[in-house]
Regions:
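Register-specific beta-strand positions within repetitive beta-rich fiber domains
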Residues: 125-133
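Short, Lys/Arg-rich amphipathic alpha-helical interaction segments
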Residues: 107-122
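Tight coil/turn sites that cap or link beta-strands
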Residues: 96-100
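Cytosolic nucleotide-binding catalytic cores of signal-transduction proteins
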Residues: 103
Length: 133
């Protein structure tokens, strides 16, 4: 039987969170924060998303349910782009095939919040021999 009691004082401790989730996106989905939502559609710190069969949207959870700085990475491992919207339906990002995006909350004053996003490792680069000399 699983217990959530500390061996160092018998206080109740929560189960550990998960850090990775594979998402098969076959319809629009609204995510929730794991501490506020039951079910499978929760945010994980790292999510690999495969969008198939259409143009789908991921709606982010309410920003005002967590602290500023809450973050996660979304990697599109499929061949189809998908959209990301805030909790009020506003456009946040389009994640193209092969892209990885880092999302974090900079304001949680509303459910929509203010999200900052940057792209990891998209594109190519090469050394310029004249710059190296």
């Amino acid at each position: 039987m699983t217990t959530y009691t500390s061996v160092f004082g018998n206080e109740t401790i929560p189960p550990s969170g998960f850090a990775y989730r594979a998402v098969a996106l076959t319809a629009d989905v609204t995510l929730g924060w794991p501490e506020n939502t039951t079910g499978a559609d929760t945010v994980a710190p790292i999510m690999n998303v495969t969008a198939t069969g259409g143009t789908w949207t991921i709606t982010l959870p309410a920003a005002n349910e967590v602290s500023v700085g809450r973050d996660f990475i979304v990697r599109n491992v499929g061949a189809t782009s998908f959209y990301v919207k805030d909790n009020a339906g506003g456009a946040v990002a389009t994640v193209a095939a092969g892209e990885s995006r880092y999302f974090y909350i900079t304001s949680n004053a509303t459910a929509a919040g203010t999200w900052s996003i940057f792209t990891y490792g998209t594109g190519t680069s090469s050394a310029d021999a004249s710059a190296l000399a």
